[in-house]
UniProtKB/Swiss-Prot annotation:
Belongs to the ACBP family. It comes from the Eukaryota. This is Acyl-CoA-binding protein. One of its GO terms (cellular component) is extracellular region. An acyl-CoA binds at residues 12, 27-31, 53, 72. The keyword Ubl conjugation does not apply. Residues 1-84 form the ACB domain. Keywords: Cytokinin signaling pathway, Developmental protein, Differentiation, Lipid-binding, Sporulation, Transport. Interacts with dhkA. Transmembrane segments: none annotated. It comes from Dictyostelium discoideum. Binds to acyl-CoA. Processed into the SDF-2 (spore differentiation factor 2) a peptide which triggers sporulation. SDF-2 appears to stimulate prestalk cells to release additional SDF-2 by acting through a signal transduction pathway that also involves dhkA, regA and PKA. Induces encapsulation of prespore cells in a dhkA-dependent manner. GABA induces the release of acbA from prespore cells and induces the exposure of tagC on the surface of prestalk cells where it can convert acbA to SDF-2. Glutamate acts as a competitive inhibitor and is also able to inhibit induction of sporulation by SDF-2. One of its GO terms (biological process) is sporulation resulting in formation of a cellular spore.
Length: 84
């Protein structure tokens, strides 16, 4: 089984780029798994990329770090079949 740390490294080695939605899901799960609940102020709506990342992370509020890491690994394993 792949560990969270291995998955986080291997995502960077994908030969094809996942969709923006997939990347945002990975980002949110990674931040929740490493930092816990979102602890930054909400970006302005005109900061489109920052706002999307904030929303992806904040949507996971209340998810434990362990659950977020497990979901990250599961998502990585799913995406690896398409992008690795």
């Amino acid at each position: 089984m792949t560990t969270f740390e291995e998955a986080a490294q291997k995502v960077k080695e994908f030969t094809k780029k996942p969709s923006n939605d997939e990347l945002l899901s990975l980002y949110g799960l990674y931040k929740q798994g490493t930092d816990g609940d979102c602890n930054i102020s909400e970006p302005w709506a005109v900061q489109v990329e920052a706002k999307a990342k904030y929303n992806a992370w904040n949507a996971l509020k209340g998810t434990s770090k362990e659950d977020a890491k497990a979901k990250y690994v599961a998502l990585y394993e799913q995406l690896a079949t398409k992008y690795a």
